[in-house]
Swiss-Prot record:
Allosterically activated by HslU binding. It comes from the Bacteria. It comes from Shewanella pealeana (strain ATCC 700345 / ANG-SQ1). Na(+) binds at G157, C160, T163. The gene is hslV. This is ATP-dependent protease subunit HslV. The active site is at T2.
Length: 174
């Protein structure tokens, strides 16, 4: 699978992801970019799960952002409604982590939209490791959101066999 982590601190939000694509127990690619900018570079998004499914979701989510003039929460809720009602979308196996200057959200394969506590998101196979590391760093250091995301992703990559050390990191300052 993968690991995606999003951290918000001091007028900065970051989404970071590793680059491993696995098929069963085989690493197929080590430098995949699972994090990108959407809607005029104002929204960050990362995915965990099936790569093909995630690209479908990125396209649909970006269309929802355009339709709702970049309003993240509204686009996420509309995307979730579609996900629940569309037979094709319901079969997609992916999670999206999305963030803008105001909100951080998880959009699940069940069509749920979750705004996590402390604006900390960690999804994918290494998500629990990254979340633990990021929580400890948020509570006990003055590191920036970028530094916390990078360090927590490194820790997850050291523990989770489906997460590697190649990182794609996107940041918004506001």
């Amino acid at each position: 699978m993968t690991t995606i982590v999003s951290v918000r601190r001091n007028n900065q939000v970051v989404i970071a992801g590793d680059g491993q694509v696995s098929l069963g127990n085989t690493v197929m690619k080590g430098n995949a970019k699972k994090v990108r900018r959407l809607y005029h570079n104002k929204v960050l998004a990362g995915f965990a799960g099936s790569t093909a499914d995630a690209f479908t979701l990125f396209e649909r989510f970006e269309a929802k952002l355009e339709m709702h003039q970049g309003h993240l929460m509204r686009a996420a809720v509309e995307m979730a409604k579609d996900w629940r009602s569309d037979k094709v979308l319901r079969k997609l196996e992916a999670l999206l982590a999305v963030a803008d200057a105001e909100s951080s959200l998880i959009i699940t394969g069940n069509g749920d939209v979750v705004q996590p506590e402390n604006d900390l998101i960690a999804i994918g196979s290494g998500g629990a490791f990254a979340q633990s590391a990021a929580t400890a760093l948020l509570e006990n250091t003055d590191l920036s959101a970028l530094e916390i995301a990078e360090k927590s992703l490194t820790i997850a990559g050291n523990i989770c066999v489906f997460t590697n050390q190649f990182k794609t990191i996107e940041e918004l300052k506001y």
